[in-house]
Amino acid sequence: MGLPALLASALCTFVLPLLLFLAALKLWDLYCVSSRDRSCALPLPPGTMGFPFFGETLQMVLQRRKFLQMKRRKYGFIYKTHLFGRPTVRVMGADNVRRILLGEHRLVSVHWPASVRTILGAGCLSNLHDSSHKQRKKVIMQAFSREALQCYVLVIAEEVSSCLEQWLSCGERGLLVYPEVKRLMFRIAMRILLGCEPGPAGGGEDEQQLVEAFEEMTRNLFSLPIDVPFSGLYRGVKARNLIHARIEENIRAKIRRLQATEPDGGCKDALQLLIEHSWERGERLDMQALKQSSTELLFGGHETTASAATSLITYLGLYPHVLQKVREEIKSKGLLCKSNQDNKLDMETLEQLKYIGCVIKETLRLNPPVPGGFRVALKTFELNGYQIPKGWNVIYSICDTHDVADIFTNKEEFNPDRFIVPHPEDASRFSFIPFGGGLRSCVGKEFAKILLKIFTVELARHCDWQLLNGPPTMKTSPTVYPVDNLPARFTYFQGDI
């Protein structure tokens, strides 16, 4: 074969496909930015739109933290991208996030990716809008009132204490912390939010299957909107259907109990409140909406708290001087001696545990369970000198906003003392946002705070522990968790501080 033939062969084999690929990237970029608002003179934010159709979704899913850090270094606090099938602007920094969170209904509206809307359903609180959202939130908030939280304290302490005894019985072989914490938080959410008694600690087969179904659903919650066999969306919907089938049994049993008994005036779980709200309005119970709401409550009530509790175990294990100060505070309230029958927790005592509150805040600053929130632009508006076109998705980043917040010094250091002296509210309101903010802030944030305080108290007064692999590598999918599931060995705390 002569040289011209070799060159022609190389051109056809390598050069031409490369040119076609580059042309496809350019055409895709032009197609995406063609949806900009041409009546607005402001430029789009900097950034790239990735590969045709897939955008930059695969890079973000596979290399999330590395990918996002690279983007932030290259483009700053606001940039365009293409995620989950939609042109998107990613936003971070207190000033930028303030505009987004305070612009609900005026500039932006909640708009989760298509996969989230499909899997969780249109009837869940996260996907409702306007008066429907306001009304549903008002009902659910009754389950998180101070009076209701007081009712939950002993239930949470009982579940946590029972779980820790199991961990301590594992001895030298240790255990994987993250899966165990997820099971614990799932049991607590079942009891408190849905009013279901899940059975003996450790969980039966049905409970384990439900936990595994939630794990499968969660893994595939943020997927490309392609519903074909073996796709992420397909697997997520399949797991969701299993969850709905199991939850429907609990809902029907609860309805029968409520119909057979008189109201006792005691604390009501969120599911009971939703059922009674429909009855009070003379509405026919919508089983599909109840299943969607129950699934969302269980997801939010155990997935995020499990992430935060696992991070607490990590940081307290890595920083023994912080654990020492936690125990000193517990001792000062008379709670360290486990044999004392008068040391039962209550809301008043928990609210006095200021240092533990600082430890939880610092944990949520460094490892916020939820990395951000999704919105859609209702109209074209200006942000930091750029146009945000109408119809584009907007993601505000919680983790990046914490990373760049000016109010925090030595940002990578775990230092709960930074929260002892409160920051001015105006400065910290949008620099520290583990529960989001504005009208869409987390409905169960007070429940989460109390749950994490009780968990920390019980952990500190029952256990010492060793992280077998040292500091873990953290991954987000969709909540933050340790890649190695945090293997650890637990022993009894002997009570000396």
Swiss-Prot record:
Pfam families: p450 (PF00067). The keyword rRNA-binding does not apply. GO terms for cellular component: endoplasmic reticulum membrane. Its EC number is 1.14.13.-. The keyword Endoplasmic reticulum applies. It is found in: Endoplasmic reticulum membrane; Microsome membrane. Its cofactor is heme. Keywords: Endoplasmic reticulum, Heme, Iron, Lipid metabolism, Membrane, Metal-binding, Microsome, Monooxygenase, Oxidoreductase. One of its GO terms (molecular function) is oxidoreductase activity, acting on paired donors, with incorporation or reduction of molecular oxygen, NAD(P)H as one donor, and incorporation of one atom of oxygen. Induction: By retinoic acid. GO terms for biological process: anterior/posterior pattern specification; cellular response to retinoic acid; central nervous system development; neural crest cell development; retinoic acid catabolic process; retinoic acid metabolic process; retinoic acid receptor signaling pathway; xenobiotic metabolic process. Heme binds at residue 442. It is a peripheral membrane protein. Belongs to the cytochrome P450 family. This is Cytochrome P450 26A1. It comes from Mus musculus (Mouse).
